[in-house]
Amino acid sequence: MSGYARRQGAPPLSRTRSLVVPDAPAFYERRSCLPQLDCERPHGGDLHPHLFGFRPTFMCYVPSPVLASVGDTGFGYGKGKCTNQGPSGAPETRFGGDKLEDLEEANPFSFKEFLKTKNLSLSKEDTTTSRIYPKEASRHPLGLEHSSPASQLMGYGLESQQPFFEDPTRASNLEEDEDDGWNITYLPSAVDQTHSSRDTQDSPPCDTYLSFFSNSSELACPESLPPWTLSDTDSRISPASPAGSPNADFAAHEESLGDRHLRTLQISYEALKDENSKLRRKLNEVQSFSETQTEMVRTLERKLEAKMIKEESDFHDLESVVQQVEQNLELMTKRAVKAENHVLKLKQEINLLQAQLSNLRRENEALRSGQGASLSVVKQNTDVALQNLHLVMNSAHASIKQLVSGADTLNLVAEILKSIDRISEVKDEVDS
């Protein structure tokens, strides 16, 4: 999944080697060598009816290579912490990260609870038969050590287990059925496939599988487990009965016990299957949420890139505007300098004009002072000019008369010239 780093060389989730359902407080301790998964655990609400009223509390220890394949999810790796972002009020399931008092609650998948359930179911049967045979009583604990969940506690991969005591009777078939039932109960489908594929090859020793969980001192042994309490119905085989042919009572008891055990295993299998489906749904939700967040991040990156491009273009526009403003300021500065120079020139011209104006004022005052003395001279000049004009007029009249008389003479000469042309023409006609 994009957006999260995956560890190199991590195998797929289907290669999960073991799922431990602990029944002792030692298995509730945190182990620094093992990664733990903390998921949500129900703190309230109605309990599922198929869990017999018990609250499902179990703990998964998964090898680190297997957990690395789930690195894309939102679960905490290696620290046993996880923050689920589910809706408020939803039921939660926690794996291995609860407090000690929460982990010490009743575990329906533990060996103790299995013993209690089996003792309660066996006590309700017919108590009239009270035959106890030492051979059968000694066989049951030994067979239990082989087929009990304590052996399953070591992990799914413990296929090299050998019983401490093998009875040639048909009870061994019952123990094999119980082993098969436990394998079906605690093995998911993906682990079953890997489990069956490893059967065809050389299986590593049990110590390699036990190293995934803890040292051998921490593993639950038959001495640390509560003893198997046999009821009246647990030993119905007569000592005189042959080893290969148990009586009808034991066959009926075996059948009822197997059916009851099968129902219990089916219920636990369904519970684990539901829990597996819930975890898968949560994983799908986390993956979808991660994809949504990745798409949102990509959208935000695109928006941020577009915004950065827009800001860059705005920055370039602002730079051009600033440059233009600087050019305008320089031009205005030049214009201001020119205006100052022009003002200086105008001031100088004003000073010159003021000087000329003062001179003209002085001349005007002088003329006004000398105007009274020059009036008599002006009158004399005007009289002389009038006399001269009269003389010119008289001479002009005389010349005009002469011109008129000269014009009359010119008209007479023109008439004479015209008559000369006529006289010549008449003479020519007479000659012809």
From Swiss-Prot:
According to its record, what is known about the domains?
Answer: Tne N-terminal domain is necessary and sufficient for basal body localization and ciliogenesis.
Question: Where do the record's region annotations for Required for interaction with PTPN13 lie?
Answer: 174-196
Assembly and oligomerization: Found in a complex with ENTR1, PTPN13 and GIT1. Interacts with PTPN13 (via the FERM domain). Interacts (via N-terminus) with GIT1 (via N- and C-terminus); this interaction is direct. Interacts with NOD2. Interacts (via N-terminus) with IFT88. Interacts with VPS35.
Transferase as a keyword?
no
Put simply, this protein is called Endosome-associated-trafficking regulator 1
Record PTM:
Phosphorylated.
Q: Its biological function?
A: May be involved in modulation of TNF response. May be involved in presentation of TNFRSF1A on the cell surface. Involved in the endosome-to-plasma membrane trafficking and recycling of SNX27-retromer-dependent cargo proteins, such as GLUT1. Involved in the regulation of cytokinesis; the function may involve PTPN13 and GIT1.
Q: Which organism is it from?
A: Mus musculus
